[in-house]
From Swiss-Prot:
The gene is ERF073. This is Ethylene-responsive transcription factor ERF073. It comes from the Eukaryota. Keywords: Activator, DNA-binding, Ethylene signaling pathway, Nucleus, Oxidation, Stress response, Transcription, Transcription regulation. One of its GO terms (biological process) is response to anoxia. GO terms for cellular component: nucleus. It is found in: Nucleus. Induction: Induced under hypoxic conditions in roots. Induced during hypoxia under nitrate nutrition. Induced by ethylene. Induced by hydrogen peroxide. PANTHER family: DNA-BINDING DOMAIN (PTHR31190), ETHYLENE-RESPONSIVE TRANSCRIPTION FACTOR ERF073 (PTHR31190:SF264). It comes from Arabidopsis thaliana. Coiled coil: none annotated. Expressed in roots and at lower levels in shoots.
Length: 262
């Protein structure tokens, strides 16, 4: 330093002054202060050259900036910043034993997400990610979306099945549309016949009663006819060389005209 010479010069006179002072004090009993030239010593310490602290200040500033960049680059795994400002992402593949280049990105977050995707592909669930919460949230949202899509698909299938089932009115409309000339037939008479047959089974049959009446009348007529034949068989003209049966047969046959009423 520039003041080193002054200090060295200042120390030597002090020792000399002490030794001389002691001797003068001892000899004369009075201390001589003339040997202490304080103003002169301070004048020698003053210097016109200013102290320069800018170099050390610049050194600390550059160090803090580099520390900030290092902290920012080390905040995420598998990324580093290029000198021109872009961010590079890469990951080590343990199977191949090489570092896989993932590309350069505009922001550190984009590079970190690219690293996360490749890490999940290589290491699976054991991968250490930069955004673990974000990936789990995405998986939950994806699972929920898939479940919602499946439920909507099942609902659409149910609606399609219900809507595809044709109703009777639709069938009638289609039949009428395809067959415009078809006449509408009233089937009420068929229902009346069916209902009438069912009622007749429970009611008494008039035809059977009529048949019974006819049979009784026929039996009465036959009985009367037999009585008449017996009457004719007892008449005197039937007596002769022919028996009664022959005379009766000849009477009905009309072969021999007999003047019964003459």
């Amino acid at each position: 330093m520039c003041g080193g010479a002054v200090i060295s010069d200042y120390i030597a006179p002090e020792k000399i002054a002490r030794s001389s002072g002691k001797s003068s004090w001892r000899s004369n009993g009075v201390f001589d202060c003339s040997i202490y030239d304080f103003d002169g010593n301070f004048d020698e310490l003053e210097s016109d050259e200013p102290f320069v602290f800018s170099s050390t200040h610049k050194h600390h500033a550059s160090g803090s900036a580099s520390d900030g960049k290092k902290k920012q680059s080390s905040r995420y795994k598998g990324i580093r910043r290029r000198p021109w400002g872009r961010w590079a992402a890469e990951i080590r593949d343990p199977i191949k034993g090489v570092r896989v280049w993932l590309g350069t990105f505009n922001t550190a977050e984009e590079a970190a997400r690219a690293y996360d995707l490749e890490a999940k592909r290589i290491r699976g669930a054991k991968a250490k990610l930069n955004f673990p919460n974000e990936s789990s949230g995405k998986r939950k949202a994806k699972a929920k979306t898939v479940q919602q899509v499946e439920e909507n698909h099942e609902a659409d299938l149910d609606v399609a099945v219900v809507s595809s089932a044709p109703s009777s009115s639709c069938l009638d409309f289609l039949w009428e549309e395809n067959n415009p000339d078809t006449l509408l037939i009233d089937t009420q008479w068929l229902e009346d016949i069916i209902m009438g047959d069912a009622n007749k089974k429970h009611e008494p049959n008039d035809s059977e009663e009529a048949n019974n009446v006819d049979a009784s009348l026929l039996s009465e007529e036959l009985l009367a006819f037999e009585n008449q034949t017996e009457y004719f068989s007892q008449m005197p003209f039937t007596e002769g060389n022919c028996d009664s049966s022959t005379s009766l047969s000849s009477l009905f046959d009309g072969g021999n005209d007999m003047g019964l009423w003459s």
